[in-house]
Amino acid sequence: MAEPSAPESKHKSSLNSSPWSGLMALGNSRHGHHGPGAQCAHKAAGGAAPPKPAPAGLSGGLSQPAGWQSLLSFTILFLAWLAGFSSRLFAVIRFESIIHEFDPWFNYRSTHHLASHGFYEFLNWFDERAWYPLGRIVGGTVYPGLMITAGLIHWILNTLNITVHIRDVCVFLAPTFSGLTSISTFLLTRELWNQGAGLLAACFIAIVPGYISRSVAGSFDNEGIAIFALQFTYYLWVKSVKTGSVFWTMCCCLSYFYMVSAWGGYVFIINLIPLHVFVLLLMQRYSKRVYIAYSTFYIVGLILSMQIPFVGFQPIRTSEHMAAAGVFALLQAYAFLQYLRDRLTKQEFQTLFFLGVSLAAGAVFLSVIYLTYTGYIAPWSGRFYSLWDTGYAKIHIPIIASVSEHQPTTWVSFFFDLHILVCTFPAGLWFCIKNINDERVFVALYAISAVYFAGVMVRLMLTLTPVVCMLSAIAFSNVFEHYLGDDMKRENPPVEDSSDEDDKRNQGNLYDKAGKVRKHATEQEKTEEGLGPNIKSIVTMLMLMLLMMFAVHCTWVTSNAYSSPSVVLASYNHDGTRNILDDFREAYFWLRQNTDEHARVMSWWDYGYQIAGMANRTTLVDNNTWNNSHIALVGKAMSSNETAAYKIMRTLDVDYVLVIFGGVIGYSGDDINKFLWMVRIAEGEHPKDIRESDYFTPQGEFRVDKAGSPTLLNCLMYKMSYYRFGEMQLDFRTPPGFDRTRNAEIGNKDIKFKHLEEAFTSEHWLVRIYKVKAPDNRETLDHKPRVTNIFPKQKYLSKKTTKRKRGYIKNKLVFKKGKKISKKTV
């Protein structure tokens, strides 16, 4: 097989100006133009001189291969954007324009507040409907990039007299940004390899399920715009390293600033870019371009990132950012030593080098230890520390482990979200390592680190998806380039690599790159003579079939797995008809219409954002999870018996309690299945009152039937979920009180409340709301009233028994008998 041409190589001159020749040259072209080097190479090969350029104009531009390539590239990118946007609209078509999941409801509520009251009111907004009685300062506790982006688009549309509701802007924001993600991925892959690979990468990321899962219409979450910012920042960084231009580096800093404002995953960037620079230093690939790019990026990016209120001084005071500072100091020391090496003798330089490195390393090490010990540098947060120690969160911080997105990724998830790209991704990585240069070192580090983090946490599959699309596109591009453009390669001799030209242009100012070994023409001919047209056709058809299966899989997964809003459920009958289960919105609307405006609703933290967003009522805890002790108090109330829970609810001024119960319809995401996490979180703060072992049977089982633990059968969560459920018989094959989710008959059917009363139960019993009774004006006496018997039955007592059991009067006064005074005494 012939060596793949390097992506930096200039575009080879084609033999004719037909559209097919332009299409074939697309895989080898980066910028779609013919330079003088290509023409000279063509003449050196003995070919005819290239045709003269056609007259200016549209027809003249399209008559050139570059014109056809530009048109073809634009068309493919437009179709990729259109396909990605269309495939994300299944939820809107099947249901309606609605916000999905949990976190997007808070983002939508914040964006609505921003659009209604302005930016400064948003920054100073104190949300009194969250975390009662504490409240929440929203402006300083969110990444505002998502809200500002949606609010800016809404303002522009209204300025142009295009009346659009802010909800529709939020719903369609992520599908729109998916097209920008495709373009940024195209630009990055083109810088890494060539234009053909970039177009394939753009098509892959437009429809891949790993990215669609967080960017469907209605998923108004930070990741919807953050992946675009991530890819665009990486593209500008690669551009900065290749050119050494301050302009591109400043653009990279601005893109990084937008990324910091949009998502907490910016920590991945501020650790991956320093890792890239550090590895380049280890590989002795230091250059002035790297020095200019990283020094400018770190200083300007650091200052810009600190302008986000939620980030503040974290870039200089947290352990997650210390690697970037260390690499910056190392780069300055390396550059200083490079400066001294040209002005000192070899012996003096070696002495100074070892002495300086020892002192600098010791000073940095002692400084880090001192600053960490004194608390100036904060240690790793629990969420980041759990990336290195996967069992840490489950033992020490159960609230982090309770989130499904923080669970380790299964092998099935990789194939489900990436399909055939999982298999072709290592091939693309091998091609990059085989033809290594500065930017390919970056993509190799990106791939390796993303694979590790995606394996540790399901949520980080999102960071793996872009690099898998890029490397898989490189692999497919090489295969198509070899099996479709073989003849043209043989007629066009290889030209010089642009990296070599860059070295010549800088006249030795840069390091000496290790160039790749090119095959001789005779060796290429021997290799390619064995490839007949049949083999080329078979391989090409196989590749096209794989791509077709990939497209079908992506569409099916998007339609069936990632296009269902969690607030509206759908089920299908045997005849194919669909049933809509709208219990969540039904219950939230009931709360909005039938409760006091200032009513306080207690529920588990999963539903806090939805209650505040749809019901507009005050909640005790929500999905922000910033106060673990407050969440543990709610978990303790749910895990305790009714009397103990009532005291907690009165302390927190709770008016209503909301629980999710799926025993009727078989909904597995209800509160009974989440109950053990409530117990674990409560046990972490109240170990004397709540113990997880009390909720298991002696055999260690968690059961809701008669064999279940008495503590479980009498706790508040169990009673609220199964109240009046023992009277319901779902079908003739199961007894009354049969739980379809856990496939068991409940153990406590005679449930009665003393301090609560049922206020609302949705149509399918999915949402149940209870009202907390006010305390009685006069406490009832627990003891029985005294009963008097007028005619008591007298029992015969013998004298012996009476003497033996003689009673006595407690504290009886003792009178001392006086003596008569005699005459003698006087």
From Swiss-Prot:
Function noted in UniProt: Catalytic subunit of the oligosaccharyl transferase (OST) complex that catalyzes the initial transfer of a defined glycan (Glc(3)Man(9)GlcNAc(2) in eukaryotes) from the lipid carrier dolichol-pyrophosphate to an asparagine residue within an Asn-X-Ser/Thr consensus motif in nascent polypeptide chains, the first step in protein N-glycosylation. N-glycosylation occurs cotranslationally and the complex associates with the Sec61 complex at the channel-forming translocon complex that mediates protein translocation across the endoplasmic reticulum (ER).
Cellular component GO terms held in the UniProt record: endoplasmic reticulum; endoplasmic reticulum membrane; membrane; oligosaccharyltransferase complex; oligosaccharyltransferase complex B; protein-containing complex
Associated clinical condition: Congenital disorder of glycosylation 1X: A form of congenital disorder of glycosylation, a multisystem disorder caused by a defect in glycoprotein biosynthesis and characterized by under-glycosylated serum glycoproteins. Congenital disorders of glycosylation result in a wide variety of clinical features, such as defects in the nervous system development, psychomotor retardation, dysmorphic features, hypotonia, coagulation disorders, and immunodeficiency.
Motif (DXD motif 2): 221-223
Record EC number: 2.4.99.18
Reactions the enzyme catalyzes: a di-trans,poly-cis-dolichyl diphosphooligosaccharide + L-asparaginyl-[protein] = N(4)-(oligosaccharide-(1->4)-N-acetyl-beta-D-glucosaminyl-(1->4)-N-acetyl-beta-D-glucosaminyl)-L-asparaginyl-[protein] + a di-trans,poly-cis-dolichyl diphosphate + H(+)
Site (Interacts with target acceptor peptide in protein substrate): 103, 405, 674
Protein name, as recorded: Dolichyl-diphosphooligosaccharide--protein glycosyltransferase subunit STT3B
Modification sites for N-acetylalanine: 2
Family, as annotated: Belongs to the STT3 family.
InterPro entries cross-referenced by the UniProt entry: Oligo_trans_STT3 (IPR003674), STT3-PglB_core (IPR048999), STT3_N (IPR048307)
Transmembrane segments: 42-86, 174-192, 195-212, 224-243, 246-260, 266-282, 288-313, 322-341, 351-371, 411-433, 440-456, 461-482, 527-552
UniProt subcellular location: Endoplasmic reticulum; Endoplasmic reticulum membrane
Organism this protein belongs to: Homo sapiens (Human)
Motif (SVSE motif): 402-405
